[in-house]
Amino acid sequence: MSGVTARMENSIITTDSGILFFDQNWTQVSSGGHQFQHISAFAYDEVKQKLYFSDLKDPKFRIFSLDANPQEEYHKVTKLLPKSDETAYITGLVFDHLERKLYWTERGTHALYSVEVDKIGNGTDAGSLISTVTKVEDNHDLAGLAIDECRRHLYWTNSYLQTSNVVRATMAGKVLNSHTEDVYEPKGIAVDHYSNRIYWVEKKFGRAFSIQSVNLEVEDVKTFISENDKAPTHVALNSRYLYWVDQQVGEVHETLKSDSTQSRVVYRGNRPTAIIIKSALLLNHQNNNPSCKSVIAKILDNVKRESEGELPQADKPTSAKPEMIICLNNGILNHNTNSCICLPEYQGNFCEIPICNNYCVHGKCVIGRDNRPTCECDAKFEGERCDRSKCDGFCLNSGNCSFSDATATCACPKNFSGKRCETAICTSDYCYNGRCMVEEGGSPKCQCNVGYRGERCEEYTCNNYCLNDGKCVLNNETMLVECRCGAEYTGKRCEIPKRFCSLDTGNPELQPYCDGIPLSSQQQQQQLVEPQISYCKNSFNRTVVYASLAFAASLFILMVILLIVRRFYEEGRPRITKRFKVTSNHTQMTSRPATQCEITIENCCNMNVCETPCFDTNLLQKSSSKAEDKQYLLDDIENIAGSYRKLPSCAGGDKNLP
């Protein structure tokens, strides 16, 4: 490997036992800084391949640098910034390649600081180079820090419970906006240049935690992971994966960005604190990003000018041996690492290998926004490198694949159908009791086993075959079903009463059954068709039914006649007619004097006796002749003790009532 030109994505993890370096397969290749056991934050310089970090327990210095080239056995550590009386717990650290500045946050002082690293060590007091970018309120705890070098923004997290939020600010520290909704205790934060989003880890209530994301304007909140029983503190990203550190169990997790359920542990060991993906993200992978082009062009121009001696070469090792390096295909020599920074189309130690060289097997190679090669495949091929025919494995069940207008189609064998021959026409359970065969039209057909019938051989042949309690059996010689009838029936299905055999039915087809003459094999085959069962019209049962119906009808008519005769000769009850005669001297009921007659009427059914006649109910219950009824009525009219009487008027005058 030679500097930043290598496409391998190396990783760096800080632990309680030092700084560990890994290759792209997460195999440890080297380590350094073993004297530092409480590293709280660190940042990476891609141009000079230096690691900047802070150690909580060091009594004199707050920030150190370490040569991060994994090819070297010994990683030199340099003390950069001394501590002061105000120096507090450093929680976040980032590096800006354009201005070559370090930015960091301190929790105790509630401030964001910066320093130009190339000016340190030139005889100037390092403490005087530190600038205060901004201060936050005392009820804010600065935690994680991230930088968007392309768009020139800073992001930090505030983990104070009452005011917790995620902040976006300018490089000068001016707050632009923040995200506060449902933010509990955010910690590590990182910028994803590939998807233009911000990710941070956050402690939730109780044992819960989550990894959240927003866009670069800290809007459009999405939950990436939400789980329990872990304590994540730091997060980093590359083009495909998100990495997060769990200090509680000492693990580093790798989670697929496109599917958060796909995750694995890539490191387990001494308590990890932070992680950096050293993948030349800025210089190599973002050179085609429109938002990054102008910034990266300036960075590369500074590298070129420094290599050519136009700019002072700060912090260059004096013991380095000169080596002649020539970068091909307009590559830029980085004197700090003595390696080449290649254009997006080339790779190799000297930028000598076109990145698209033999990359696409059957297609055209193009360079994406992340400077990675991608393939535009020919019509009949697919895959990351167009190395797989669309017909490979497309047709199932021995189907033959062919192309029709660059679309893969399948010619299926006889027993299968579907776009990919995935559907079996004759499934194992299609014919219940038989063998399935495919007809010429592609439809399934069942050949039933002996003793079964139906479209899918679902019906036992003997089911409901023999009538009148006949017993169905299978003939072992002919393999046909036969009926063993009782004493009163005969026929193929025991459908003919034997008593009809003595009658002259005129049906010669029934005669062989009645006579007991065995049928020929041809007749037996014809009898496989179930005969239509018919019955004699003059049967005994029908005669009984008709006779019963006739008797019931006659009885009903007789009863109707008797009721009519009885009604005709029955004597009617007398009808009483009441007449009222009105004269001129008759006083109306409403105009009579106040003095009224008090009348006691016994057994009267209506109190208004002057208007309504009354009857003696006892007399009505007696059976008497018509003449006797009239006599009783006349007697009651004359007799004041009867059920009905005429009342004198209250005035005592003559009454003209009848």
UniProtKB/Swiss-Prot annotation:
SUPFAM superfamilies: EGF/Laminin, YWTD domain. LDL-receptor class B repeats lie at residues 100-142, 152-195, 196-241. GO terms for cellular component: plasma membrane. The chain crosses the membrane at residues 544-564. Residues 1-543 are extracellular. Residues 352-384, 387-422, 458-495 form the EGF-like domain. Residues 565-658 are cytoplasmic. It is found in: Cell membrane. This is Protein cueball. It comes from Culex quinquefasciatus.
